[in-house]
Swiss-Prot record:
CDD domains: TrpRS_core. It holds the Pfam family tRNA-synt_1b. One of its GO terms (cellular component) is cytosol. It comes from Leifsonia xyli subsp. xyli (strain CTCB07). GO terms for molecular function: ATP binding; tryptophan-tRNA ligase activity. A motif ('HIGH' region) lies at residues 13-22. This is Tryptophan--tRNA ligase. Its EC number is 6.1.1.2. ATP binds at Q12, P13, S14, G21, N22, G150, D151, D152, I189, K198, M199, S200, K201, S202. A motif ('KMSKS' region) lies at residues 198-202. SUPFAM superfamilies: Nucleotidylyl transferase (SSF52374).
Length: 337
């Protein structure tokens, strides 16, 4: 426990590797935020099973995601980095919160409406419907003051705030009412082949996705083949030049240099030179992450030790909040012997 503001965030273990969009859009910013926050970062495997998962693959993806968190700079001795299912209080609090969530309230969640419309009623699980309630439990368990999320998750944080205020009003002050911390606008990375679409593991083609664990030569080929346009001018114009603008955003995020500076560097030069420069930046940034991830995966006992220690720390914090909620709602608590 520190005097720093409490922060909670997480990502699903939904692929063998996280991608560049995950890194720039979340991990890179988490790394910066952990220095000034009492941070809890979770691999949210309970959320992952709202769609069908192969059990062996889920375990492997969970381990690989945790390793990439660490390799990308999340320090498990500074932040609490754990696997969601290792802390049973997540599911316990989610049930309590579901009893004060209105059906219409849950049905209005945009992500549920979009995904259920694509999948159809028969293929849509109750778990997907109640996903935002579990997310609320994730946040409220740790008395999070701030929740760094993309703009597409803002609605879920608003629901979390509503549930916290509703519970507090009915049962007495129990939960901290969190604030959404919307991540930087420039942090959204788009598909290299379809730069109008966000980089996503569910893309039709893997050619537009740079994975953190891609070998350098694979990453180079993807960048050199990235969609641009025909005018040959390296300049940022999200509406008119989405492909080049996306590459400039990547260059800026990974190099720490302003887009305007990069534009000046490549003034009068073609896209070939620009892409070659970007390849160097990407390989320099992602190479150490790939190497460290592979080291961690080669020593599963050490990775398990880290995760177990952090889960114990997370569990202690979560149990305090859960006990307060149980007491407030009127559950008969077991007698300690």
């Amino acid at each position: 426990m520190t005097d720093s503001p409490r922060l909670y965030s997480g990502m699903q273990p939904s692929a063998d590797s996280l991608h560049l969009g995950n890194y720039v859009g979340a991990l890179l910013q988490w790394k910066e935020l952990q220095a000034a926050h009492d941070a809890f970062f979770s691999v949210v495997d309970l959320h992952a099973i709202t769609v069908a998962q192969d059990p062996h693959d889920l375990r492997e993806k969970t381990r690989r995601t945790a390793a990439q968190y660490i390799a990308a700079g999340i320090d498990p001795s500074v932040s609490t980095l754990y696997v969601q299912s290792h802390v049973p209080a997540h599911a316990q609090l989610a049930w309590v919160l579901s009893t004060i969530t209105g059906y219409g309230e849950a049905a209005r969640m945009t992500q549920f409406k979009d995904k259920s419309a694509k999948q159809g009623a028969e293929a849509t699980s109750v778990g997907l419907f109640t996903y935002p309630v579990l997310m609320a439990a994730d946040i409220l368990l740790f008395d999070a003051d701030v929740v760094p999320v993309g703009d597409d998750q803002r609605q879920h944080v608003e629901l979390t705030r509503d549930l916290a205020e509703r519970f507090n009003s009915r049962f007495g002050e129990t939960f901290v009412v969190p604030q959404a911390m919307i991540l930087k606008d420039g942090a959204r990375i788009y598909d290299l082949q379809s730069p109008e679409s966000k980089m996503s593991k569910s893309a039709d083609s893997g050619a537009g996705i740079v994975w953190l664990l891609d070998e350098p030569d694979i990453a180079r080929k993807k960048i050199m083949r990235a969609v641009t346009d025909t005018d040959g001018v390296v300049s940022y114009d999200r509406a008119g030049k989405p492909g080049v603008s996306n590459l400039l955003s990547i260059y800026s995020a990974l190099s720490g240099r302003a887009i305007q500076q990069i534009e000046l560097d490549y003034e009068g030069k073609g896209y070939g030179d620009f892409k070659k420069g970007l390849v160097e930046v990407v390989v320099d940034a992602l190479g150490p992450i790939r190497e460290r991830t592979l080291e961690l995966l080669a020593d599963p006992a050490e990775l398990d030790r880290i995760l177990a220690g952090n889960a114990a720390r997370a569990g202690e914090a979560a149990e305090i909040t859960l006990a307060k909620a149980y007491e407030a709602i009127g559950f008969l608590q077991p007698t300690r012997r």
